[in-house]
Amino acid sequence: MDEYYQVHNINEAINALTDESKPFPPALLYTFSDLNADDIRILKAAWPSLPLMRRRTLLEDLIDMAERDNLMMFEEVGKIALEDEDADVLVSAIDLLFQAEDSRLIPTFLRLLQNASLNERVRAAAANALGPYVYLGEVEKIRPELLQNIVEVLLNIYANDLSDLVRRRVLESLGYSSHAAVPELLRAAYFRPEVAWQESAMFAMGKSADDQWQSFVLANLEHE
């Protein structure tokens, strides 16, 4: 009976998403938490045919709900949405997965970041999502070779990419890294004239375990 109830609910939610003539019932948002294998299969098959605005607003609503209730687990929806082609959907999917701490997501985030044909907001979101995995690598919670791969890609993107937004998000994620190249990158960004770069440098310094940045952070706080 429980299995039928779950399948019935996911189908009800999908039908409600498909019917744009009626508002989507907020109570059905709970259906997308803790999806079982059948739910995942059904939603994945239906996802491409869901109206674009419904896909966008669904993810936005799930992000809001997850922020208000940490018992809600929408990671499987986020993983399905990572295969979407819409930039807004992709950004929201990445945001929904930001705290997943699932190393299986690393290749996908790296692929999105390195795809120069994608919207820069998608690539910036992917760069941002890699930050927690740099931290996990530094505290030895993921394999060293995974950390090395992430940092090498981030450094390469930072050195060669044309998007300032992407490069700033890369710098912020590199703040967690103990790589020898990072301190000079942070220092150079901090002394750039653009406020956005200064803010990214400060954000990265705040993530760093390197004590040399303490004076920079304190000076900025006093200035504010």
Listing of model-derived features with the role each one plays in the protein:
Residues 2-23, 37-41:
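N-terminal leader/linker segments that initiate helical-solenoid repeat arrays
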Residues 36-40, 71-75, 105-106, 143-151, ...:
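Core helices of alpha-solenoid repeat scaffolds
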Residues 5-8, 53-54, 77:
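Short amphipathic alpha-helical interaction elements located at domain edges
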Residues 1-7, 21-27, 74, 95-99, ...:
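Short N-terminal helix-initiation segments at or just after the protein's N-terminus
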Residues 16, 42-50, 77-85, 108-118, ...:
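Alpha-solenoid HEAT/Armadillo-like helical repeat scaffolds in large eukaryotic proteins
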Residues 15-35, 45-48, 56-69, 80, ...:
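Structural detector for internal amphipathic alpha-helices that build alpha-solenoid repeat scaffolds
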